[in-house]
Amino acid sequence: VSSFTKMDCIAIENAIVALQYEFSRQFAIEELEKKFQNDILNNILNDKVTSEAELEKSAGLLQLDKNGNYRVIVFGVKNEGKPQKDMNEKLLHISCLEEAVRRRLPDVKIHRDLDKIVAIKEADPTKTQAVHRTEMREIIEQVQAEMKYQNKNLKVRAGVGKIVSGLIRLPESYKEAGDALSFIDIAGDISGSEDSAVMMFSDFGIFKLLCQTDDPQMLIEY
């Protein structure tokens, strides 16, 4: 049996360095892909796509059917421990949320914003509203289960927009999902469910009008 030599040590050290380099390279590629996807989704969600050709190219890069059925879910977190005052702490919480959504919902496309995570999910328009509502609650429970390992004081909340046909209409669902998340506490107070974790815009009823007008005077009248 040959003895362990200095050359063996050098070979092992070189192998470790090579592995570290490969892991670093893969991480850098993944981060670039996330950034690239984030920029594309930002343009689609904010209605900045200016042509059919651009839409087709974006759909191809995202590996999405431009004519498919989708809905937008906007995730946020609420710290039930101490108030979030430090911006770095808030960003850390959003990073934890992003990781939780990616782990539990590997099939959705994710756009990261400053204070929220936006998920684009394929949707079946033939399912009933009750079925969709149940699915959304299950999604929140899954993400919340993942978040408890990060910080037990962080509560996941989500607003859900309508199902739209075609990527070009995603801004409609995105606006609804954002409005639903913004009004989740108010809606919970009205419904008597203070512990609301998910709100579908379609469940707002007449309160949809509050989100669909930019006229301050009309809002005062309501």
Predicted regions and their residues:
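Regulatory loop-to-helix N-cap segments in sensory/regulatory domains
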Residues: 2-9
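Cytosolic nucleotide-utilizing catalytic cores of signal-transduction proteins
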Residues: 9-10, 15-222
